[in-house]
Regions:
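Structured beta-strand/loop patches that form or line metal/cofactor-binding pockets in enzymes
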Residues: 35, 39-74, 78
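C-terminal binding/interaction regions
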Residues: 15-22, 26, 35-38, 118-156
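Active-site- and interface-proximal helix/loop "cap" or "latch" segments in soluble metabolic
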Residues: 76-136
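Buried hydrophobic packing segments
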Residues: 29, 87-95, 146-153
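Extreme N-terminal basic, low-complexity initiation segments
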Residues: 1-9, 13
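Functionally engaged cysteine thiol sites
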Residues: 56, 81, 139-142
Length: 156
């Protein structure tokens, strides 16, 4: 005799769409974090800072080469989660050739976004949109860790 097993799905179609979207976003974050071109130690750095998240233990060190107020090289290293690594990777790719003032501006934007003072990602910071969304609000401290290290550098 055969036994038939019936089950009722606990998910609605809209839930399944959201689950697929969440998996897609998580895969995109993994993809970004896996771009480790600038996960390196810069020996001839001009500026450096470390940040540590006391909640989870993530830590990151950022070393920069800044010449004539312009960022010419960006290296990061640390023991951190995929969200922190993805943020550091995006920043390292997108801030090369930026003035210190622009780096300061993006650090301020990041903090204000997660403190709900910004509703959406400004066009000039669109490269951050995969990380800067409501879904990742619980990972705020992880995402902000590289920004905190950068802010220490540009504030001096």
């Amino acid at each position: 005799s055969t036994t038939k097993i019936y089950f009722k799905s606990i998910y609605k179609i809209s839930d399944i769409h959201e689950i697929k979207l969440n998996v897609y976003m998580d895969l995109k974050i993994l993809e970004i974090a896996s771009d480790t071109e600038n996960n390196k130690n810069i020996k001839n750095y001009t500026h450096a800072a470390k940040s540590k998240n006391p909640l989870c233990g993530d830590e990151i060190q950022i070393k920069l080469v800044i010449k004539k107020e312009k960022l010419v090289d960006f290296g990061y290293q640390g023991k951190s989660c995929v969200y922190c690594q993805a943020t550091a990777s995006l920043l390292s790719k997108n801030l090369i050739n930026s003035e210190k003032s622009k780096i300061n501006e993006i650090c301020d934007f990041a903090k204000s976004f997660f403190n709900k003072k910004q509703e959406s990602v400004e066009k000039k910071w669109s490269f951050l949109s995969k990380l800067f969304n409501e879904k990742n609000i619980s990972r705020k401290e992880c995402i902000l860790l590289p920004f905190n290290a950068l802010k220490k550098i540009v504030s001096n």
